[in-house]
């Protein structure tokens, strides 16, 4: 067994907000000695024509994950935009394929965390909780974000992110990008999560 703790940052992004947070979180994970991070996406199921119609990004170059490889990691951080207070269908579809891993207990005892993006804030926490219920059914250990960075207390500007997980406000038209404070919280989440995953692995 390797002494290295392996963490997967797995995400779905339509307009780039989650992609930005995922990279910040991965950078935070990488700051912890003895922890290796992988950054991957779940497959897209919408047609190229429809994605073009809604002006979604299609230029992401992050590798696509397979369901079976989840068992190879000691911790999994999942990022998904909010869809009516729930995770995006693309992430839902991917997680619905983990029944085989569940049947064999392959994810029991591993660390799990999540992060999200919403238009104006509605549904952020329920989206994160919709991810966490999957972790609990798999016997994983849910890891949130403690109030361990000043940005978690900052109310000087509109921002997202809290103890449930890092988040960003995209604005009604998606034009707002993650702020410096939101990105700092995301990086802190990655760093904190990596430390917990490392301890759980022992």
Curated annotation (Swiss-Prot):
NAD(+) binds at residue 15. One of its GO terms (cellular component) is membrane. Residues 7-193 form the Flavodoxin-like domain. Disulfide bonds: none annotated. Keywords: Flavoprotein, FMN, NAD, NADP, Nucleotide-binding, Oxidoreductase. It comes from the Bacteria. FMN binds at residues 13-18, 82-84, 117-122, 137. This is NAD(P)H dehydrogenase (quinone). The lineage of its organism: Bacteria, Pseudomonadati, Pseudomonadota, Alphaproteobacteria, Rhodospirillales.
């Amino acid at each position: 067994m390797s002494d290295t703790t392996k963490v997967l940052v797995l995400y779905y992004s339509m307009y780039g907000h989650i992609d930005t947070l995922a990279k910040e979180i991965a950078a935070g994970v990488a700051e912890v000695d003895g922890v290796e991070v992988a950054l991957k996406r779940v497959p897209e199921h919408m047609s190229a024509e429809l994605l073009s119609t809604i002006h979604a990004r299609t230029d992401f170059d992050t590798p696509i994950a397979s369901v079976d490889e989840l068992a190879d990691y000691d911790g999994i951080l999942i990022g998904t935009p909010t869809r009516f207070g729930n995770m995006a269908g693309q992430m839902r579809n991917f997680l619905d394929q983990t029944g085989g891993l569940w049947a064999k207990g392959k994810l029991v005892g591993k660390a799990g965390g999540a992060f999200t993006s919403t238009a104006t804030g509605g549904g952020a926490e329920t989206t994160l909780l919709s991810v966490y219920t999957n972790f609990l059914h798999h016997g994983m250990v849910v890891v949130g974000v403690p109030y361990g960075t000043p940005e978690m207390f900052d109310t000087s500007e509109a921002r997202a992110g809290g103890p449930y997980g890092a988040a960003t406000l995209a604005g009604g038209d998606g034009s707002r990008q993650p702020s410096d404070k939101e990105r700092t919280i995301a990086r802190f989440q990655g760093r904190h999560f990596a430390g917990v995953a490392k301890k759980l692995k022992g």
